[in-house]
């Protein structure tokens, strides 16, 4: 693209780092809990929350992945919810609970008032709820390949002698 500055990835952010996207000032917020590396990126009146929060009727991300921690997740959610109430929150994904149409945007005010895992709950209540719920969840279907790519910082494995790249999937260990 002409006239657009590009950069070589990866770029690593620390909590509170500021950066620019075009003319927009942005802030990186470290929001661990789902995994240790989770980040929320605030851009103007919008925040991209990754797997920290879901839509209010979906609650929050699981915290039983490697390095996940329900207490950290609660603290991270509180950090996101400390943004102004009108801040638009964009979800990483949505499961459309109870047959609801898929949505991807809510606000801080909506989450505070209606999130089924957060609204009216103390930190200890959230940890108990999240821990109990996580014990009932199956391993995601793509967790093995996802971990292999994530552990390489998003890079795929090196190609074999034929130039093909492979992820390993155990057939008798799950």
Feature locations, PLM:
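Catalytic core of the metallo-beta-lactamase
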Residues: 10-94
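Glycine-rich, flexible loop/turn motifs
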Residues: 8, 15, 59-61, 104, ...
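Short, small-residue-biased leader/transition segments that mark boundaries at the very start
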Residues: 1-9
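Generic alpha-helical secondary structure signal
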Residues: 4, 48-49, 103
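Accessory terminal helices/loops
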Residues: 75-88, 95-174
């Amino acid at each position: 693209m002409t006239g657009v500055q590009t950069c070589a990835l990866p770029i690593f952010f620390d909590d509170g780092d500021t950066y620019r996207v075009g003319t927009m000032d942005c802030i990186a917020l470290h929001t661990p809990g789902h995994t240790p590396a989770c980040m929320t990126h605030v851009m103007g009146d919008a925040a991209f929350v990754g797997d920290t929060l879901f839509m209010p009727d979906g609650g929050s991300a699981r915290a039983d992945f490697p390095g996940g921690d329900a207490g950290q997740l609660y603290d991270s959610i509180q950090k996101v919810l400390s943004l102004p109430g009108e801040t638009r929150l964009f979800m990483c994904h949505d499961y459309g609970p109870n047959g609801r149409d898929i949505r991807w945007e809510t606000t801080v005010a909506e989450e505070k008032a209606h999130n089924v895992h957060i609204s009216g709950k103390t930190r200890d209540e959230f940890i108990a709820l999240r821990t109990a719920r996580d014990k009932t969840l199956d391993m995601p279907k793509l967790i093995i390949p996802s971990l292999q790519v994530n552990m390489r910082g998003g890079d795929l494995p090196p190609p074999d002698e034929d130039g093909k790249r492979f992820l390993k999937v155990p057939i008798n260990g799950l």
